[in-house]
Amino acid sequence: MSPFSETSVLLLPMVEKCINLLQTYGVSSITKLRQIHAFSIRHGVSISDAELGKHLIFYLVSLPSPPPMSYAHKVFSKIEKPINVFIWNTLIRGYAEIGNSISAFSLYREMRVSGLVEPDTHTYPFLIKAVTTMADVRLGETIHSVVIRSGFGSLIYVQNSLLHLYANCGDVASAYKVFDKMPEKDLVAWNSVINGFAENGKPEEALALYTEMNSKGIKPDGFTIVSLLSACAKIGALTLGKRVHVYMIKVGLTRNLHSSNVLLDLYARCGRVEEAKTLFDEMVDKNSVSWTSLIVGLAVNGFGKEAIELFKYMESTEGLLPCEITFVGILYACSHCGMVKEGFEYFRRMREEYKIEPRIEHFGCMVDLLARAGQVKKAYEYIKSMPMQPNVVIWRTLLGACTVHGDSDLAEFARIQILQLEPNHSGDYVLLSNMYASEQRWSDVQKIRKQMLRDGVKKVPGHSLVEVGNRVHEFLMGDKSHPQSDAIYAKLKEMTGRLRSEGYVPQISNVYVDVEEEEKENAVVYHSEKIAIAFMLISTPERSPITVVKNLRVCADCHLAIKLVSKVYNREIVVRDRSRFHHFKNGSCSCQDYW
């Protein structure tokens, strides 16, 4: 007997029968829902019936994404008096889930104005989800105050929604305030605040929170692991990352593709290319993200030719289509290996074969490709031919290349463009000052310094991070705040002496102060990465590898010094600066002095 037959209809009151049909067939498709809706109208059920409308709206909103919200709203608009808050909540939830926060808020305001119903414990989490989609922290604060006034602020799932809202909006201070005031914190709360710190430039705080969570006996899940690995990758906390890897193996999370991809990214971003390749080979399942992660990882670590070979293998055997990010990695590899011709060929293939329209990042790679090869005039012509306005990164790339290759006129032009887009970035002033200093144009150096003072621009201090055990140590230039400072500086003195015996002469051309040579030499001796390496030499076993994460570009003097340290002390040293990795071994660097 058909569920829509007249005989079966007579067995139950019509509204109840239609609701039963919805419960039986409603989750299958929009077609079934339309049939049941039409069936109800044909058999005399009023289109304003609230009970049937409630169920129909629920099943419409519950359909696979994207649900037919316009249809659901039409059903809602026909209900004469929607006095059931469930109906309002369902529609608000539907709009929040598809990212239509404007309609969600419009419906909420309509609810308050109508006076038919009051928001309940479920209304605000759905509304907060809509704010989260908008990433509007001010509106979120308004909703937060309404939640408190309504008496729902102590409910854990409301608190978790608020916590996620602030973290997603980048307001980690407010997120932590909500978290700190929660009398009971479940795993969802810990995950939200850890991820908030990890994704908003506070990886150290994320790791500290994980340590606290672990001490309270709360077991991490896959979401925690992803956030934790992301934080480890950002500050080069390889030891902790490896511990997380061991935990993943123990609980079976290595079978989770997303977690494995993030772990792969960790090894690549910590300069551990061999571990990344081993993990990649061991992964049972791989997607385009896996391949792209390793391709980009090889590229930024200076193994550009390997990155290109891996890309060719992916194309020929795996049947996976590269994405925009894959080509960023390939173009980056060509740029940092000086493969200009190959870079232009891959750019052509991206557009013509894969129909990927280049974004600003791809054009930036092409400018970098020419600029690094010393073709700064061609790089400038390429910028002028771009179909979009160059951003500050592209002009900064040109400025950096001009300072390296000594084109002061074009460097000054690039800086003028940068000043219009981002006037107070100290690195641009420093680049130009370095170029003037290398040319001994001290009056121009002084002009730049005076302009920095006049504009209130302060140079970003260089810092270097290293990890010993499970602790990350930070060093600044000339830093003597570390408890082992005396031993560190004694090692630094010994290190400098041994390097001099190998023929090391400090590279001081970019020390942009017109002072005596000895003072300039002292200035470069105490750069943060040298202090960090001296600390690692006294804190780790002989011949063990050293990893340093630096926030600025490695200067020419430190690059030369670290090459010699790797030879004299028989250490493999990986330095991740703001643009790439340098693998120092036996007196040479993977960048082949091309950075």
UniProtKB/Swiss-Prot annotation:
Residues 501-595 are annotated as: Type DYW motif. GO terms for biological process: RNA modification. Residues 394-469 are annotated as: Type E motif. Residues 470-500 are annotated as: Type E(+) motif. PPR repeats lie at residues 84-118, 120-154, 155-185, 186-220, 221-255, 256-290, 291-317, 323-353, 359-389. Keywords: Repeat. GO terms for molecular function: RNA binding; zinc ion binding. Gene3D superfamilies: Tetratricopeptide repeat domain. PANTHER family: DYW DOMAIN-CONTAINING PROTEIN, PENTATRICOPEPTIDE REPEAT-CONTAINING PROTEIN. Belongs to the PPR family. PCMP-H subfamily. This is Pentatricopeptide repeat-containing protein At4g21065. The gene is PCMP-H28.
